[in-house]
Amino acid sequence: MSLSKFMEKQTSLNPLVIGATLFFVVLLVAMILIAPEQTQTLLNAAKSGIFANFSWFYVLAFSVFLGFLVILSVSSLGNIKLGNDEEEPEFGFLSWLAMLFAAGMGVGLMFFGVAEPLTHYLSDITTGSAEHKQQEALLHTLFHWGIHAWAVYGTIALALAYFGFRYKLPLALRSCFYPLLKERINGKLGDLIDIMALLATLFGVITTLGFGASQLGAGLHQLGWISENSFSLQVVVIAVVMSLAIFSAISGVGKGVKILSELNLTLAFCLLIFVLVAGPTLYLLSAFSDNIGTYLSNLVQLSFKTYVYEQEHTGWFSGWTILYWAWWCSWAPFVGLFIARISKGRTIREFIFGVLVIPSMFGILWFTVFGNTAIWLNDGEAAGTLGQMISSPETLLFKFLDYLPLSGVTGLVSLVVISLFFITSADSGIYVLNNIASRDKSLAAPRWQAVMWGVLMSVVAIVLMQSGGLANLQAMTLLVALPFAILMLLMCFSLWKGLNADKKYFDTKVNPTSIFWTGDKWKERLEQMMNQTQEKDILRFLKHTVLPAMRELRQELIGKYDLSVQINTLFEQDEPAVELVIQKDLMRDFMYGVKSIGREVSEQLINDDNLPHIQHSMTYEPYTYFFDGRVGYDVQYMDQDELIADMLKHYERYLSLLDDVGQELMAHEQTELAE
């Protein structure tokens, strides 16, 4: 069997995407194994080059992402739904917020919750009195973990959800560029987009796994279960955790993993509450309010600050802010895909508010509780002991807990939380990598692919950590995130173009229902209004008014204009319907349908003696629906000729708009683009 046949029959992978990615990764691993010192020098030079020449770009790009989302949220484009106009959200608002809250949790908060504020507090980036230094330390931490990170996630998530649920394209990164590339998203340019996204995601996940492995080793050492946190131990940790993640991915125990994830969130929240209560509670609550104010009041200045006038701080700026911005870029497809999948049916305004505000507020709370408490302990009971350990940030959380009650219990809980975050991140990472690398997002990936991704992530993480520790992982993230950040700016332009095409398309209205009313039929109209229609009445209307109107129009379109037209009668389904479909070769078919829609009637109306015609708890109406997902309207007062006129109005709208903006929105069905 040839390689191409094998790839087609035995995998869901896109040969070019996976081939280019594996070539890059294998080349990197080979270089490290064959010439470790030279490769280390090369990575350091590349990292220094990006710091020196592209830091400004990262700063401006992240400000653009945030500004872009804010503009969308306050404009009329914010009213657009992520799905059809009548689409209801898949999850309730509170459930959706809870899932966004879950997306904001992870290994990073456990690793940096204590370490980062304390490190900034003791560095020369903060100045003045101890109180002022503490305030600035929290400010810089919150800037790194706040709304900018979620603006990056939100940009990708919004593009994925919009083009996936509104344009009916596959939930894939290449789909986000449809307004710019059209059908070329299915060609080599689409493959290039996926390659860049795959590399960024791969190294972003690997970096997170590296942080998790080093902190798990430190936790085991702190609890006295091992003698030292060695590299060999971290290899064992990565192997064990990745084996569990692979088992989860191939065994169909997703429901069990979901339960573990919910348990883990509960444990993390309990740990947060414990530190809040066991620490200086009133001080922390006051600091939480103060930190929010300090963060918001300095947000604009920090968003554009490159330290060009403070050269003594450029090393700190590169090693913290720019590395974070690169990490968030590489992590964005991972988090963005999750957010997109749970956000169907939300308006863009609601989506942006939820994604930017809820996780950011939780991040402020987390770093306030852990960061402010750590600094408070370091300056008090710990007498500087915690500050002496900032060069080993993986150990700081456990040393920090030693100064609080029940340190043995909380240390064990922290270890469990980190382990479960590690497992669920790796499991989800396997899914996302499979999704990006697949040639058809609707295909189920074979089990061996999960094993391949798990082994690949483990090997690359181990090799990079062995050659240069976490610094090498961060260097690779920085390198692959730069082109992806450029890609994201193009994504913003593509999304803007799509949204404006959408607004122009759907703002073109057709006057429904009563536009045809004239005074000569007022008695008939009144009689219809005074009748509480039931399903049998609507079925009769569909069969004796709508269907004959469609047949008459179909006969004219076929006989005189040689169009391909069909009528679908769907009287046996839960919502009886009839459809007129005018078929096209390249564009999406025009479809005008009418279906029976039931709605509940309130008890007050039924019991009102002045409304004797309302006797039933349900009333039914014939509502239109269309090929492009627009919200329909009631047509029960139309006669046969008026229905034909209504269908022609929509067909004229279809033809005039399709040549202008509609071709970007309605040119293809989802199945065609998934092939």
Where in this protein do the model-derived segments appear?
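Flexible loop linkers connecting adjacent transmembrane helices
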Residues: 2-8, 41-47, 74-93, 118-140, ...
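Membrane-water interface regions at transmembrane-helix termini and the short interhelical loops
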Residues: 3-10, 35-50, 69-90, 137-144, ...
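Transmembrane-helix boundary/entry motifs in multi-pass membrane transporters
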Residues: 8-16, 51-56, 85-103, 138-147, ...
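Extracellular/periplasmic helix-exit of transmembrane alpha-helices
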Residues: 112-124, 276-298, 360, 364-391
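Membrane-interface interhelical connector segments
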Residues: 297-314, 372-408
